[in-house]
Amino acid sequence: MSEKTVKYEVKGPLAVLTLNRPNKLNAINTKMMADINKAMNQAEEDIKIRAIVLQAEGKSFSAGFDLDDEVWEAKGEGELRATLEQDFDLIMRFWDSPKPTVSAVQGYCLGGGMEMALACDLTVAAENALFGEPEVSIASGVVALLLPWFTGPKLAKELLLTGDTKVPAQRIYEMGLINRVVAL
């Protein structure tokens, strides 16, 4: 039986997408990417849906891209480039959506998970949320393109050059990267 990596619910005018790999801190694998795209298509095509909410099951929003996923075992530059383009396209789905997107973040929100959350029109984080970009120690991706749009170059570089994975929600709010910090 195939794992249901994304739950899709309609709540009035909202489509609620729930990342559903809590045992892996909602790390984004190939299956989850396909499931997110399918859910986004469904929400965007439904004329009754006015906005899309992205949230996660469990104690963390997302630990980022699942490095145990076989897609990261690229055999050459071409395959790695294709993987990075697929990751970019996934994140930009939220940025480019014709419907407003809102991310609700709790716990760890790292790497690709942080990029996906920040690509939403609005981001609300629980007080326990911790943000970071650990992949900057190996490579830089979408985040290097997105961060300067949200915050000035100095603050973007602070996140990109440190690779800190435990930046509290309040600091991220002060940097202008999220809209609200709320009690859990």
Spans of model-derived segments:
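A short, glycine- and basic residue-enriched loop/turn
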Residues: 22-25, 59, 64, 128-130
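Residues at secondary-structure transition points
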Residues: 23, 27, 34, 78-88, ...
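Glycine- (often His-adjacent) and acidic-residue-rich active-site loop
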Residues: 56-93
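Crotonase-fold acyl-CoA enzyme core
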Residues: 93-184
